[in-house]
Amino acid sequence: MFVEHNLIKNIKIFTLAFTLTVVLIQLSRFISPLAIIHSSYIFLAWMPLCVMLSILFIFGWRGVVPVLCGMFCTNLWNFHLSFLQTAVMLGSQTFVVLCACAILRWQLGTRWRYGLTSRYVWQRLFWLGLVTPIGIKCSMYLVGSFFDFPLKISTFFGDADAIFTVVDLLSLFTAVLIYNMLFYYLTRMIVSPHFAQILWRRDIAPSLGKEKRAFTLSWLAALSVLLLLLCTPYENDFIAGYLVPVFFIIFTLGVGKLRYPFLNLTWAVSTLCLLNYNQNFLQGVETEYSLAFILAVLISFSVCLLYMVRIYHRSEWLNRRWHLQALTDPLTLLPNFRALEQAPEQEAGKSFCCLRIDNLEFMSRHYGLMMRVHCIRSICRTLLPLMQENEKLYQLPGSELLLVLSGPETEGRLQHMVNILNSRQIHWNNTGLDMGYGAAWGRFDGNQETLQPLLGQLSWLAEQSCAHHHVLALDSREEMVSGQTTKQVLLLNTIRTALDQGDLLLYAQPIRNKEGEGYDEILARLKYDGGIMTPDKFLPLIAQFNLSARFDLQVLESLLKWLATHPCDKKGPRFSVNLMPLTLLQKNIAGRIIRLFKRYHISPQAVILEITEEQAFSNAESSMYNIEQLHKFGFRIAIDDFGTGYANYERLKRLQADIIKIDGVFVKDIVTNTLDAMIVRSITDLAKAKSLSVVAEFVETQQQQALLHKLGVQYLQGYLIGRPQPLAD
């Protein structure tokens, strides 16, 4: 039963393909443009070749026999040849065509006859547009040397002048390069009428859309008018001389605006009209050489048209590719914030979840950028299996990821993700890294204007969440979060304004030894709205927004101005100034500080530079270089908050420091805590071995003062010694 079904199917396919071959070959012979050279008719485009290729493209190997039978019957009918002559002529016409198709099948695989205008275009152009016409002509020459044919067609088999052969060969090129797709679309629409709708929707209707409709209609109108003028029986030198170039210009303008199938069809129909009704188009073409030149021009422009379209589509593809790459983080390969901004309305009603990696910034400073990328990729690999198919993950600037969740139980799912992340280490270069995570979530309404404030509020809330690793919901805290983020922004603007206007207030707190000698530490305040802002409010924002170097330089310059107007004969230090850690990371900061002192003619011995405690340097070499340059210039270096971390010992070992300032955490309970006393004793012994001075901070009682002096501390600082007073006083 199955075999019978296949047999019936193959018979139907053979009948359809054979009928189409016979009918379309007769049609193609009828519409093929003709010319007369040396009293012999010659085709300007041999369109039966287009019919053969169209049948083979549509039916594949099942079209081989129908093509052979159809060509045999039409040759027998049209030329009244003997059976042998018909068979030999058939072989010369079809052998090279079938071989070229077989080579394409071998090179391109089973898809060799699909996507004719989009894929493997140049391979088909070479084998079918170049090799096949040359092969057919060589085959006919070879056959003509062994067999005799009627005078009517003998010129096609070599019994003609060279120019006749040239025009005949050009007619084969013209057929394949210009009219092949015209017959392919016609044949395919006959086989499958539904293809007409596909062709219209895919390749023609887009040109009639709202944006291109005016251009397309104007283009078609101009082409129609031009064809009417060129094809009219009325001969005119003006039409023939000036309007023919416009014909090529019109099609050049269509590149980029019209789809190639639409452009190719109009080009084929237009050239067919011009070659058949050629009173004006071929006016003045009186020799076969001129005719060969005209055909060569049409062939060349057809190839150029195809090339221009391919180049345009490739540039469009590259633009789309570059646009997509601009929407993707190049290192983590996650969609970035720009991708989120493209179509925010698509995410309306979904939950936006901000996941913060708390210590990623610090870790990346120590281990490098690639560690940061590795961590984000590891986190993504952990999160993606926990997300649904339509949920997304975005890379946000900084240390945050954005999860767009659409399922229920958002807070519970997000908390589960955070718990999993907090329970795992990320391994980098055989080192396990403990990363801290926090998250916050809120509903997004799809409004572009609310996207930025929402992300800002979620970011702040996620940062608060890192302290206890509990997910926070924005819905219940929106007012509070909005107030906090607005307050932070206003505070930052206030700080910037104060720095721009130089609204600094310098306070001095005494640092004294047993004899009451010493120097004062400079403490800065900011003036704003008639009030004073203390360091605990503005220093975190100054560090966070990279204003450290600017702030420290302004403090130093204000102090130097005061020193320049209040000279003193005292030798040794008069003040100390604390430099923030990020200031020392500036490569040229040492030179700028030195230039300030030279400008105001202040000796570097007058000011001690204090280095604040920091858990680790992101670029220790830059800091060490700056400190070394300052030390060489003559500054004395003090290490602040000494004893609270390994970094201080590491600094002490590498730096040529002059002073150690013991952190107040070891001083406040030193009278009652013997361990604090032992720590202070070890620090003073270490300082004595390196010939360093020691300063103790937060000294508030006489008992602390007495014990610290007994333990070897030379200088004391605190409310007992003196409270900060305005420098102007």
From Swiss-Prot:
It is an enzyme of class 3 (hydrolase). Keywords: c-di-GMP, Cell membrane, Hydrolase, Membrane, Transmembrane, Transmembrane helix. Residues 348-476 form the GGDEF domain. GO terms for biological process: regulation of single-species biofilm formation. SMART domains: EAL (SM00052), GGDEF (SM00267). Pfam families: EAL, MASE1. The chain crosses the membrane at residues 17-37, 41-61, 83-103, 126-146, 163-183, 214-234, 238-258, 289-309. It catalyses: 3',3'-c-di-GMP + H2O = 5'-phosphoguanylyl(3'->5')guanosine + H(+). It is a multi-pass membrane protein. It is found in: Cell membrane. Induction: Expressed during exponential and post-exponential growth at both 28 and 37 degrees Celsius. Repressed by RpoS. PANTHER family: CYCLIC DI-GMP PHOSPHODIESTERASE PDEA-RELATED, CYCLIC DI-GMP PHOSPHODIESTERASE PDEF. This is Probable cyclic di-GMP phosphodiesterase PdeA. It comes from Escherichia coli (strain K12). The lineage of its organism: Bacteria, Pseudomonadati, Pseudomonadota, Gammaproteobacteria, Enterobacterales.
